[in-house]
Amino acid sequence: MKKISLLSTALLSCLIMGCSSVSQTVSANIPAVSRDAVYSKPRTQNNFNDYVQFLKGKAVTEGVSPATLNAQNNIRYIEKAVALDRAQAGRTVKRDPNQPPVLNPNGTTNYLNKVLTNNKVNVAEERYWEVQVPLQRASQRYCVQQEYILALWGMESSFGHYQGRYDVLSALATLAFDGRREALFSKEFINAMKMLDRDHIQRARMLGSWAGAMGQTQFMPSAFLNYAADGNGDGAKDIWTNQFDAFASIANYLHTVGWDDKLPWGIEVTLTQPIDLSLSGIEKNKARSLRDWQAQGVMPLSFSAQEQAKLTALSHTDLWLIRPDKQVGRAFLVSNNFRTILDWNKSNYFAVSIGMFADRIKERIGL
């Protein structure tokens, strides 16, 4: 009778929520699946539940307990997540390799105008005074300047206001099943299961973006497992509702991947003479001293007091020339801190926006 009751409950829930695209596992037997196994059945929605079981089998191999895996039912196929992922991919225009690239001299400027508004700087100033205690604690503990923690918090989740309302397991399983980036999203699905298995959060609270990024930090599950930190000593790593933990996690991430709190991110420069585009980039062998760059005509764009202070700090370290819009747009000399921001998000546009946002926060607040 108990098995019939469980089955009836599952069927009723399926009817309410939309049937075939909902995983309703009640069996305790989840066979292990090799890490390298490839799903061979057609990627049609009627196979989605079977694919979820396939991923759970891989999670068994990764050490996730059967009890945790069996408790995670109602994993749904989210069509909107697939649509958003494909739309994002569609914004990257494929060009004919036999044709020269189309250059956009305003790419960096357009991006900054969109994401780094005066209103965002105003909000950052207001929020700074509200979160000063947890922000300073994270800054001091992990040796990361406050303005960079605040800038990442503001950019990633709009100061904690936008965290996403998607069920993370469903989003990750959906995007893995879609196949465009299966290796990434299947790995993140298993890492999300590990989070649940280690009691970091309850499933009902594990909400995030359509791509599975979570909390005020917008960490993917792998980033959570590697960098999430307990900022207030309560034993939890709550990046969703606890600012002590959110700021500690941001700072721990940067610190772990090589942040130096004695350095700024970089400065904007002007090129007073032609310079080969091949010299730009963040590869280690492209680093030069400030003196070497200046000898090649790379000069500060601004001579404000803030930029001069940054220039002094940058005069004792390796620097890289960054030209996000290739040979036609703006240029920047950046420190290794810029490279650590790229570890967070590999977009040069994003990294420049974080650096400039941090500069404006520092200037506005007087840090």
Residue locations for each model-derived region?
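C-terminal motif of bacterial Sec signal peptides marking the signal peptidase cleavage site
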Residues: 17-18
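An acidic, Gly/Ser/Thr/Pro-rich helix-cap/linker signature
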Residues: 22-130, 136-139
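Secretory-pathway/luminal and periplasmic proteins that interact with or process carbohydrate-rich
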Residues: 78-85, 157-166, 178-182, 198-204, ...
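Substrate-binding clefts and substrate-entry loops adjacent to catalytic sites
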Residues: 113-126, 174, 179-186, 200, ...
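Bacterial N-terminal signal peptides that target proteins for export
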Residues: 1-8
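Short, functionally critical alpha-helical segments immediately adjacent to catalytic or ligand/cofactor-binding
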Residues: 59, 68-80, 145-160, 192-195, ...
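Flexible, glycine-rich surface segments
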Residues: 203, 207-314
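C-terminal soluble interaction/assembly domains
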Residues: 269-367
